[in-house]
Regions:
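H-loop/switch region of ABC-family ATPase nucleotide-binding domains
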Residues: 145-146
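Catalytic Walker B motif of ABC-type/P-loop ATPase nucleotide-binding domains
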Residues: 110-113
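Conserved ABC ATPase "signature" region
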Residues: 4, 8, 15, 62-80
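A short, proline-enriched helix->beta-strand linker immediately N-terminal to the Walker B motif
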Residues: 104-108
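Helix N-cap at the start of a conserved alpha-helix in ABC-type nucleotide-binding domains
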Residues: 121-123
Length: 168
C-alpha cells in the first residue's frame, strides 16, 4: 500500500490474498473510499457520520474525533454543516461530507468510485475543487471517473478502460 510491501499468498483458486487477517485489517485501516452515492447514514448528523469510524476503528475519544471531523469539514468548505442531516443537503454537499468522512481516517490512499456521476452537473465543480486540492497536497488517490479533463489535470498516471480492456 503506497510503497509498503505486504505479504501475500496464492489461494487454491489462484487469487492473491493476504497472508493473515491482522495484516488485512491493518491494510484496510490505511485506505478510505468515497462512493458514487455517498453512503452517508441518513439517521445521523454530518458530525456523527464523520466521527463514527475513528471512534470504532481506532478507539479514538469522541472529543478527538470531533476535533478531527471539524478540521476536515472546514477543508471541504462545510464547517457550518455539522448538525445537518444528509437528506437536507445537496448531492454536492453530501459528496463533500463523504470526502471529509474519508479524510477523518487519515488514510494513505483514498479510493474514489465515480464521485461525480450521481451529481447534477452544476454541483460537479464543487466536488472536483475539493479533489483538486487533495491532489495538490500530494494525496494518493485512485479515481474512477468519466471527468477526463479533470483526470488529466490532477493525475501523474492514467489508466483507461475501453471495451473492458485496460489501455495505458
Amino acid at each position: 500500500l503506497n510503497g509498503d510491501v505486504r505479504n501475500l499468498k496464492v489461494n487454491k483458486s489462484g487469487e492473491l490474498v493476504a497472508s493473515d487477517a491482522k495484516q488485512l485489517q491493518h491494510f484496510r485501516s490505511r485506505l478510505s473510499m468515497v462512493f458514487q452515492h455517498f453512503n452517508l447514514w441518513q439517521h445521523m448528523t454530518v458530525l456523527e457520520n464523520l466521527i463514527e469510524a475513528p471512534i470504532r476503528v481506532f478507539g479514538m475519544s469522541k472529543a478527538e474525533a470531533t476535533e478531527r471531523a471539524r478540521q476536515y469539514l472546514a477543508k471541504v468548505g462545510l464547517q457550518n454543516a455539522e448538525d445537518k442531516y444528509p437528506s437536507s443537503m445537496s448531492g454536492g454537499q453530501q459528496q463533500r461530507v463523504a470526502i471529509a468522512r474519508a479524510l477523518t481516517m487519515e488514510p494513505e490512499v483514498i479510493l474514489f468510485d465515480e464521485p461525480t456521476s450521481a451529481l447534477d452537473p452544476e454541483l460537479v465543480g464543487e466536488v472536483l475543487k475539493v479533489m483538486r486540492a487533495l491532489a495538490e497536497e500530494g494525496r494518493t488517490m485512485v479515481i474512477v471517473t468519466h471527468e477526463m479533463g479533470f483526470a488529466r489535470e490532477v493525475s501523474n498516471h492514467l489508466i483507461f478502460f475501453h471495451k473492458s480492456m485496460i489501455e495505458v
